Amino acid sequence: MVSEAIAALKEREGSSEFAIGKKKE
């Protein structure tokens, strides 16, 4: 369960970083 939460957090961080990067461009 803990590893699943960490994986979800990492996915959210990655997608938010990707969105910010796209907005900057």
From Swiss-Prot:
GO-annotated cellular components: nucleosome; nucleus
InterPro entries xref list: Histone_H1/H5_H15, WH-like_DNA-bd_sf
Presence of the UniProt keyword NADP in the record: no
BP GO terms, sorted: nucleosome assembly
Residue ranges, compositional bias (Basic and acidic residues): 9-25
Compartment(s) of residence: Nucleus; Chromosome
Chief location of this protein within or outside the cell: nucleus
Molecular functions (GO terms): DNA binding
Source organism superkingdom: Eukaryota
Keywords: Chromosome, DNA-binding, Nucleus
Residue ranges of the region described as Disordered: 1-25
Location of the H15 domain: 1-25
The protein's role, per its UniProt record: Histones H1 are necessary for the condensation of nucleosome chains into higher-order structures.
Designated name of the protein: Histone H1.1
Source species: Triticum aestivum
